[in-house]
Regions:
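Conserved short strand/loop->alpha-helix "switch" segment adjacent to the catalytic nucleotide/phosphoryl-transfer site
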Residues: 28, 34-39, 95-117
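Short alpha-helical segments that sit at the start of domains
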Residues: 1-21
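A short, conserved structural fragment
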Residues: 55-65
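Short amphipathic alpha-helical elements of helix-turn-helix/winged-helix folds
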Residues: 20-28
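Short amphipathic alpha-helical interaction segments
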Residues: 42-53, 110, 114
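Conserved beta-strand-loop-beta-strand hairpin that lines the nucleotide-binding pocket
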Residues: 66-77, 121-149
Length: 149
């Protein structure tokens, strides 16, 4: 007689495995399923089901068999000095970056506020550019802010 034992991981363990999967995808790690399964001591089919769930949730996309990439989203914000967009750094932060980090921990939001403020103040005070383009690129693991003048 064969018996099948089903093991359901705690939500924390599943989140840790998913996070590791995403980090390995970002690092372009070969043999993703095998690497993750060996690291966590789980069946590769469990890893495949987690990967498929990440694809369904559009957190990652399949490139080809065994190869995935993180799904990134981009937002562009044109700012104009003549329109008053560069009169203070809080306007640019509130309009361009804040909506994309509102669910982050408060300390992370504070760090972003400081860094973004330094970047935009440099443009406001030194470049005197009329037009500034801010691009926010975000995936499940990273957020990038680019300020071009």
């Amino acid at each position: 007689m064969r018996r099948c034992i089903s093991v359901k991981f705690s939500e924390d363990r599943k989140q840790n495995i998913n996070r590791y999967i995403l980090e390995k995808i970002q690092q372009n790690s070969p043999s993703l399923s095998r690497t993750v399964a060996e690291t966590f001591g789980v069946n590769p089919s469990t890893i495949h089901s987690y990967i498929n769930e990440l694809v369904r949730k559009q957190i990652i996309r399949k490139i080809k068999r065994g190869e995935y990439e993180l799904v990134s989203h981009k937002w562009d914000y044109p700012l104009q000095r003549s329109a008053g967009d560069l009169d203070n750094d809080t306007y640019a932060f509130d309009k361009c970056l804040s909506p994309h980090i509102k669910d982050f921990a408060n300390n992370i939001q504070d760090i972003w506020s400081y860094v973004f403020s330094e970047m935009i103040n440099n443009v406001m005070d030194h470049s005197m550019a009329e037009n500034v383009q801010i691009r926010i690129i975000q995936n499940f693991l990273t957020t990038t802010a680019i300020i071009a003048d």
